[in-house]
């Protein structure tokens, strides 16, 4: 699995066990990602921070 990094032109291969791509952004600025990469379990979103996870690189 390859997930995009914070710089959109680059991607990285996920290590074993981390089989989800994720994107984290502030709810106030949904167009500006704060973090993106590979993760094992999708974190819960909060009032300030939202996570988008999926098993391809399309979501992040």
UniProtKB/Swiss-Prot annotation:
Compartments where located: Secreted; Target cell membrane
Biological-process GO terms, alphabetical: killing of cells of another organism
Disulfide bonds: 3-21, 14-38, 42-53, 54-59
CDD domains on file: TFP_snake_toxin (cd00206)
GO cellular component assignments: extracellular region; membrane; other organism cell membrane
MF annotations from Gene Ontology: toxin activity
UniProtKB keywords: Cardiotoxin, Cytolysis, Disulfide bond, Membrane, Secreted, Target cell membrane, Target membrane, Toxin
Presence of the UniProt keyword Disulfide bond in the record: yes
Signal peptide residues on this chain, from the entry's feature table: none
Tissue: Expressed by the venom gland.
Keyword match Ion transport: no
Main location (coarse class): secreted
Protein family: Belongs to the three-finger toxin family. Short-chain subfamily. Type IA cytotoxin sub-subfamily.
Subunit architecture: Monomer in solution; Homodimer and oligomer in the presence of negatively charged lipids forming a pore with a size ranging between 20 and 30 Angstroms.
Its biological purpose: Shows cytolytic activity on many different cells by forming pore in lipid membranes. In vivo, increases heart rate or kills the animal by cardiac arrest. In addition, it binds to heparin with high affinity, interacts with Kv channel-interacting protein 1 (KCNIP1) in a calcium-independent manner, and binds to integrin alpha-V/beta-3 (ITGAV/ITGB3) with moderate affinity.
Protein name: Cytotoxin SP15a
Biological source species: Naja atra (Chinese cobra)
Lineage of the species this protein comes from: Eukaryota, Metazoa, Chordata, Craniata, Vertebrata
